């Protein structure tokens, strides 16, 4: 009998073991679709980004008009740009849902997979930030100025660090060129980290909604989950194309239709919607260094999650109190997102401060406490 190339060829064998003959739990729900959706997002973003980079000029005098030129004169340039800009939003929707799934079902107990995932989130955030600066509109320029300026809060080396990052004494041409270089490079770093993420995942196998060992009941990834993933792709690509074709500027800021002007500050500087929760936490602390530390902590706290798991059961499927707390956390994040988009005035200041406090309290104190309480309740 001739050897099966799919199982014997050094390269095809790797593809086979991770996408075709991979044993997967039979009961994983649609919440397990987001990993593959993120893969599709990454591929779409790299493809559209490559096409955009061919028409982009990373120079302060030409950046804005080169983007306008792409939209006006390049074949389907408007579509490529709209897919790229809104694709970023869908990337973040998918990653937030993916993290939420991991949190709800205790997937963070696979520590290496979880930690590489958090590193992926941080890299994605960095990529989105430097990418937002490239069109060189008003919000691009002032967003870059405000966020890079935060590094000046670091004691002793802060100011030097900021000027080193800027390549001068303000956000200018050197900043734009290096941000373009970084924006081109980082997606490939994300792709590399994704492979590490998957390598760690395939060491343990997937978790499942019950959080129990499922080795006795595994099914092949293909055709069952390949088909399910294709359904997921359709469910994501449909709203993405709808958004890109019907209201491409819905999630953008109108300020970005104005070319960058260092002499005029926009009335409300705010980032894209996917950073608003962190921005609200940053603004809720009146002290600059304190705000920067809170901003960093709001994302880095994810590294602590595996150590804060005190429950005997892995998932929240049969833990109603933890479920309630989880949805309170989700609501809290939505409130933070809303507050981040509002001006700094009463009542938004106090709402933001309370929501920020609640965010850290839930994660650091309430989840471990409720987990321990539920353990006690199991004994009765």
UniProtKB/Swiss-Prot annotation:
- Could you say which residues bind heme b b566 here? 98, 197
Superkingdom, taxonomy of origin: Eukaryota
Q: Sorted alphabetically, which Gene3D superfamilies does this protein's record hold?
A: Cytochrome Bc1 Complex, Chain C
Database matches in Pfam families: Cytochrom_B_C, Cytochrome_B
Q: Show the CDD domains listed in the entry.
A: cytochrome_b_C, Cytochrome_b_N
Cell location: Mitochondrion inner membrane
Query: Which amino acids does the record list as binding a ubiquinone?
Result: 202
The answer on whether this UniProt entry bears the keyword Membrane reads yes
Q: Which residues bind heme b b562?
A: 84, 183
State the UniProt keywords alphabetically. Answer: Electron transport, Heme, Iron, Membrane, Metal-binding, Mitochondrion, Mitochondrion inner membrane, Respiratory chain, Transmembrane, Transmembrane helix, Transport, Ubiquinone
MF terms from GO for this chain are: metal ion binding; ubiquinol-cytochrome-c reductase activity
Instruction: Please list every transmembrane segment annotated in the UniProt record, as residue ranges.
Output: 34-54, 78-99, 114-134, 179-199, 227-247, 289-309, 321-341, 348-368
Cross-referenced InterPro entries: Cyt_b/b6_C (IPR005798), Cyt_b/b6_C_sf (IPR036150), Cyt_b/b6_N (IPR005797), Cytb/b6-like_sf (IPR027387), Cytochrome_b (IPR030689), Cytochrome_b_C_euk/bac (IPR048260), Cytochrome_b_N_euk/bac (IPR048259), Di-haem_cyt_TM (IPR016174)
GO BP annotation list:
mitochondrial electron transport, ubiquinol to cytochrome c
Q: How does it sit in the membrane?
A: Multi-pass membrane protein
What does the record give as cofactor?
Answer: heme b
Indicate the principal place this protein occupies in or around the cell.
mitochondrion
Q: How is the cofactor bound?
A: Binds 2 heme b groups non-covalently.
Question: Which Gene Ontology cellular component terms are annotated?
Answer: mitochondrial inner membrane; respiratory chain complex III
Q: What else is known?
A: Heme 1 (or BL or b562) is low-potential and absorbs at about 562 nm, and heme 2 (or BH or b566) is high-potential and absorbs at about 566 nm.
The record's function comment reads: Component of the ubiquinol-cytochrome c reductase complex (complex III or cytochrome b-c1 complex) that is part of the mitochondrial respiratory chain. The b-c1 complex mediates electron transfer from ubiquinol to cytochrome c. Contributes to the generation of a proton gradient across the mitochondrial membrane that is then used for ATP synthesis.
Assembly and interaction partners = The cytochrome bc1 complex contains 11 subunits: 3 respiratory subunits (MT-CYB, CYC1 and UQCRFS1), 2 core proteins (UQCRC1 and UQCRC2) and 6 low-molecular weight proteins (UQCRH/QCR6, UQCRB/QCR7, UQCRQ/QCR8, UQCR10/QCR9, UQCR11/QCR10 and a cleavage product of UQCRFS1). This cytochrome bc1 complex then forms a dimer.
Identify this protein by name: Cytochrome b
Q: Which organism is it from?
A: Pterodroma hypoleuca
What does UniProt list as this organism's lineage? Eukaryota, Metazoa, Chordata, Craniata, Vertebrata
């Amino acid at each position: 009998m001739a050897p099966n190339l799919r199982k014997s060829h050094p390269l095809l064998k790797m593809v086979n073991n991770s996408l075709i003959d991979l044993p997967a739990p039979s009961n994983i729900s649609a919440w397990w679709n987001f990993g593959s959706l993120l893969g599709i997002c990454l591929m779409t973003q790299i493809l559209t980004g490559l096409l955009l980079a061919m028409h982009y000029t990373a120079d302060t005098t030409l950046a804005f008009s080169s983007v306008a030129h792409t939209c006006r004169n390049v074949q389907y340039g408007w579509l490529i740009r709209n897919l790229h800009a809104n694709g970023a939003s869908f990337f973040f929707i998918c990653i937030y849902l993916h993290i939420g799934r991991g949190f709800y079902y205790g997937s963070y107990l696979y520590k290496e997979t979880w930690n590489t995932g958090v590193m992926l989130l941080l890299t994605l955030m960095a990529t989105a930030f430097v990418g937002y600066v490239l069109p060189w509109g008003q919000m691009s320029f002032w967003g870059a100025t405000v966020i890079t300026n935060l590094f000046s809060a670091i004691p002793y080396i802060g100011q030097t660090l900021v000027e080193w990052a800027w390549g001068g004494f303000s956000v200018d041409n050197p900043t734009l060129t290096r941000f373009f270089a970084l924006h081109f490079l980082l997606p490939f770093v994300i792709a590399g980290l994704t492979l590490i993420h998957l390598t760690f995942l395939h060491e343990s196998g997937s978790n499942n909604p019950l959080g129990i060992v499922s080795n006795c009941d595994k099914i092949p990834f293909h055709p069952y989950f390949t088909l399910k993933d294709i359904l997921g792709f359709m469910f994501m690509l449909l709203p993405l194309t709808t958004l890109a074709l019907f209201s491409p500027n819905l999630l953008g800021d109108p300020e970005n239709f104005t070319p960058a002007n260092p002499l005029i500050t926009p009335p409300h500087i705010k980032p894209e919607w996917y950073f608003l929760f962190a921005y609200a936490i940053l603004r809720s602390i009146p002290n600059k260094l304190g705000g920067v530390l809170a901003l960093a902590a709001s994302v880095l706290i994810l590294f602590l999650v595996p150590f804060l798991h005190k429950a005997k059961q892995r998932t929240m499927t049969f833990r109603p109190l933890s479920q309630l707390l989880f949805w309170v956390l989700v609501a809290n994040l939505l409130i933070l997102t809303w507050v981040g988009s509002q001006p700094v005035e009463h009542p938004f200041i106090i709402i933001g401060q309370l929501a920020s406090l609640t965010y850290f309290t839930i994660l650091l104190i309430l989840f471990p406490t409720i987990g321990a309480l539920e353990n006690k309740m199991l004994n009765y």
